[in-house]
Amino acid sequence: MASVDFKTYVDQACRAAEEFVNVYYTTMDKRRRLLSRLYMGTATLVWNGNAVSGQESLSEFFEMLPSSEFQISVVDCQPVHDDATPSQTTVLVVICGTVKFEGNKQRDFNQNFILTAQASPSNTVWKIASDCFRFQDWAS
């Protein structure tokens, strides 16, 4: 990270997170069969404590979920320091919001993503390396 100042990395992380969140939740709600394409081949999803790894297993998992309507309230992001992920541009994205799965009540959720930049000669694509989803049940 020495060649570019930290503010540039933060700005890049924010732009990537904003674009990613729009693509991810639109795909989740409207084109779920394509959702696993946003994940790296070795990615792991932890959904309320249950781990799912690999694109084929992720596809099967997402297809089992009822149709959804996500509403995003908060998006926070930060670049992951180069010492933690050498030679990889990595961003941590934290999301809070509500989701209504068909046949279920609306619930609060938190979701954390670790995204890595996958560069090709023509562009850079952000892929999910890790995803942790949790329903948020508040104490009354």
From Swiss-Prot:
Matches recorded under Pfam families: NTF2 (PF02136)
Superkingdom, taxonomy of origin: Eukaryota
GO BP, sorted A to Z: mRNA export from nucleus; protein export from nucleus; RNA export from nucleus
Entry GO terms, CC: cytosol; nuclear pore; nuclear RNA export factor complex; nuclear speck
Subcellular localization: Nucleus; Nucleus speckle; Cytoplasm
Keywords for this protein: Acetylation, Cytoplasm, mRNA transport, Nucleus, Protein transport, Transport
SUBUNIT field: Heterodimer with NXF1. Forms a complex with RANGAP1, RANBP2/NUP358 and NXF1. Interacts (via NTF2 domain) with NXF1. Stabilizes the NTF2 domain of NXF1 by heterodimerization. The formation of NXF1-NXT1 heterodimers is required for the NXF1-mediated nuclear mRNA export. Preferentially binds Ran-GTP. Associates with NXF2, NXF3 and NXF5. Does not bind nucleoporins (NPC) directly, its association to NPC is mediated by NXF1.
SUPFAM superfamilies registered for this protein in UniProt: NTF2-like
InterPro entries per the UniProt record, alphabetical: NTF2, NTF2-like_dom_sf, NTF2_dom, Nuclear_transport_factor_2_euk
Principal location class: nucleus
Residues with N-acetylalanine modification: 2
Name of the protein in question: NTF2-related export protein 1
Keyword Nucleus on entry: yes
Molecular-function GO terms, alphabetical: small GTPase binding
Function recorded in the entry: Stimulator of protein export for NES-containing proteins. Also plays a role in the nuclear export of U1 snRNA, tRNA, and mRNA. The NXF1-NXT1 heterodimer is involved in the export of HSP70 mRNA in conjunction with ALYREF/THOC4 and THOC5.
Domain (NTF2): residue spans on this chain: 16-135
PANTHER family in the record: NUCLEAR TRANSPORT FACTOR 2
PROSITE patterns in alphabetical order: NTF2_DOMAIN
